[in-house]
Design a protein with these regions (language model features):
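Helix-loop-helix junctions within the multi-pass membrane cores of secondary transporters/permeases
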Residues: 1-35, 56, 76-86, 90-138, ...
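Loop-to-helix transition at the N-terminal end of transmembrane alpha-helices
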Residues: 43-62
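Helix-loop-helix hairpins and the membrane-proximal interhelical loops
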Residues: 1-48, 161-163, 195-286, 430-431
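Conserved, well-structured core segments that form the ligand-binding/active-site neighborhood
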Residues: 71, 201, 205, 320
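Residue-level signature of catalytic and energy-coupling elements of molecular machines
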Residues: 18, 38, 122, 191, ...
């Protein structure tokens, strides 16, 4: 196993990789309960969704570990699932098979773009300063997710955001999670992120945040699988998507989101996992992008929305994960969760707050690599750093930075220095913003 995953070569140990895989899994486990809750509104059986969510995440995370050998984990993406639930009733005539076919088509197209080298080429064309900014923006985004999930940050009364109710049980569990994680990290205790999650889960029991499981074993239900080939008015659902302009526009919008979300996530995890080169390139990026693109199509076929590389993967990398063994461990746990999902869902999102906030802190170090005194570098970087958390969208934040970079270069008379693919990406984002 050491030789297969190059564990010793990357200055890690099998024990560290297994622990990091468990940390990633626990940081992502909330999706097992949340994804069915969101998509069941589209008419899909919740039990089938829980089963397929676990299996889809498990299979594609294992694939990521084996083929890319990097500590990234995959699962159904939030945001996209809510959009799919919405278009099922508004655009797809209540037929969720058609909605999942939109995801399937988007995944296939992205996979083709990766195989022909376009996605990797665009990533290589991103200026180094924007790569640093993406890591910082992702750090703030991850911290925002953790703080919001724990109710520490909430919608304010008369303001966009505000401090949550400090007497709320979820607030208290979130604070405990942060304090334990930081205290252990200060003492360089191995597995501080994982311990922080476990302590918070235990602390949540008397506070009523950690709910007792409704059972132990969940029956397997595969009825959500096969949406694109299901009948939709006399034709396969995928055919209906290909012949409907409105659905094709939605597929393009999802494609842009997936296209750049994974780029940002890969850079963030690469920084924590120490596989980001000095010039800002992600090692094994082609393999990562191939698996991620295939995962989107697999998610559509399994009826669980787009499966994508999870930004919470940074928690496993921050906990010492350096190889694909971390991913394989998380993937196996997801597959086991298909049988024991009632137990897994006791891990509340508030319990993972400390891990996410601490990872966000670690990623802020990239800000020192940006020359803030140069407006042509600092302003586009700032648009990404501010845009990602404030729009609550990785792709939207990256798009704002790309467009700002091109505009500032035009103002300075340095348009000739911009690589052609950056022009294409900026124009694509303009179209995306109008379409979305």
């Amino acid at each position: 196993m050491d030789e297969l995953f190059h564990v010793s070569e990357r200055k890690s140990t099998i024990g560290t990789e297994l622990r990091a895989g468990l940390t990633s899994f626990l940081a992502m486990a909330y999706i097992i309960a949340v994804n069915p809750a969101v998509l069941s509104g589209a008419g899909i059986d919740a039990g089938a969704l829980a089963c397929a969510t676990c299996l889809g995440a498990g299979i594609m995370t294992i694939c990521m570990g084996i083929f890319a050998n990097r500590p990234l984990a995959c699962a159904s993406g939030l945001g996209v699932n809510a959009m799919i639930a919405g278009i099922t009733t508004t655009v797809c005539g209540g037929d969720w098979h058609v909605a999942m076919s939109v995801i399937f088509l988007e995944g296939v197209v992205i996979l083709l773009l990766v195989l022909c080298g376009l996605r990797e080429a665009i990533m290589d064309a991103i200026p180094v300063v924007l790569r640093h900014a993406i890591s910082v923006g992702l750090g703030l985004f991850i911290a925002m997710i953790g703080l919001c999930d724990a109710g520490i940050i909430t919608a304010g009364a008369g303001t966009l955001v505000g401090l949550g109710d400090i007497t709320s049980p979820t607030f208290i569990v979130g604070i405990i999670s942060i304090l334990v994680t930081v205290a252990l990290a200060c003492r360089n205790v191995p597995g501080s992120l994982l311990i922080g999650i476990v302590v918070a889960v235990i602390a949540g029991i008397p506070l009523g945040v950690t709910q007792a499981p409704t059972g132990i074993i969940a029956p397997l239900d595969f009825s959500s699988i096969g949406g694109p080939i299901a009948d939709a008015g006399g034709v396969p659902a995928i055919v209906k998507v290909l012949t409907d302009p409105a659905l094709l526009v939605i597929s393009f919008s999802l494609l842009m989101s997936d296209f750049f979300d994974t780029m940002g996530t890969a850079m963030a995890v690469a920084k924590q996992g120490e596989f980001l080169t000095d010039d800002g390139n992600v090692e094994n990026i082609k393999e990562i992008l191939i698996v991620d693109s295939a995962a989107a199509a697999v998610g559509g076929f399994m009826g669980v929305s787009s499966i994508t590389t999870f930004v919470e993967s940074t928690s496993g990398a921050a906990d010492g994960g350096r190889t694909g063994l971390t991913s394989v461990t998380a993937g196996v746990l997801f597959i086991l969760a298909a049988f024991f999902s009632p137990i897994v869902t006791i891990v509340s999102s508030a319990a993972t707050c400390g891990a996410l906030v601490y990872v966000g802190y670690l990623m802020m170090s990239e800000a020192s690599e940006i020359d803030w005194s140069d407006v042509s570098q600092g302003f586009p970087a700032f648009m990404i750093v501010a845009g990602v958390p404030f729009t609550y969208s990785i792709s939207a934040g990256i798009g704002l930075g790309f467009i700002a970079y091109v505009i500032v270069a035009l103002f300075k008379g340095e348009a000739s220095k911009i690589k052609p693919l950056m022009w294409i990406a900026a124009l694509a984002f303009l179209v995306y913003f109008f379409v979305a």
